[in-house]
Design a protein with these regions (language model features):
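Arg/Lys-rich amphipathic alpha helix in sigma70-family domain 2
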Residues: 50-57, 67-88, 111-112, 164, ...
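A short, charge-rich alpha-helical start-of-domain segment used by transcription regulators
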Residues: 5-25
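DNA-recognition helix of helix-turn-helix
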Residues: 63, 70, 74, 118-122, ...
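Internal acidic/polar
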Residues: 83-112
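Short, small-hydrophobic-rich alpha-helical interface motif
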Residues: 4, 23, 27, 37-48, ...
Length: 182
């Protein structure tokens, strides 16, 4: 990061390679449009490069870049009035460490696809702030503090969003015939 702050284009390109997937993933969730998300990801990195001097080196780079991506996506949604969408699942909401990717809930591929569809439908019914908090927690592996930084909300609010979303997802999946405890 020090070299990028010093103006090294090669160092910044390395940052882009490192964060391209999480930024694109976040933007696809926000917009529901991969082509638009790719454009917004490029815009995100241009903004990050232009604002490197504003980066607080005491913070995590991932949270800063994802915050820029979030703002860029929200701005685009406001301009285009796109409804936010999200996909994913996760682990314990009270765990302060970043989440690991969840293991498949069922070994049967057909059942796994059906569960994924049920989960996607359930996620689509959540409030956008809850969907985004869940996605940042379980897809991007951010801590609650980092989620708070990205969404500009207190850590306790980030915890609450994730907890309430998980509770609602469990209720919706159970209503659809899935046992959320398996």
């Amino acid at each position: 990061m020090g070299q990028a702050l010093g103006g090294s284009q090669a160092a910044f390109e390395q940052i882009v390679r490192r964060y391209q997937r999480p930024v694109l993933s976040l933007l696809v969730r926000l917009t529901g449009d991969r082509a638009l998300a790719e454009d917004l990801a490029q815009e995100t990195f241009v903004k990050a490069f232009r604002n490197l001097a504003a980066f607080d080196v005491t913070r995590r780079l991932s949270a800063w870049i994802l915050r820029i991506a979030h703002n860029t996506g929200i701005d685009a949604m406001r301009r285009r009035r796109i409804r936010a969408v999200s996909l994913d699942t996760g682990s314990r909401p009270d765990d302060p460490t970043p989440a690991e990717p969840a293991a498949p809930l069922t070994p049967d591929p057909v059942e796994r696809v059906a569960l994924q569809r049920a989960l996607e439908a359930a996620l689509a019914t959540l409030r956008p702030d809850q969907r985004e908090a869940v996605a940042l927690r379980y897809e991007e592996g951010l801590s609650f503090d980092e989620i708070g930084q990205v969404l500009r909300i207190p850590e306790v609010t980030a915890r609450s969003h994730v907890h309430r979303a998980r509770k609602e997802l469990a209720r919706l999946l159970a209503a659809a015939g899935w046992d959320p405890r398996r």
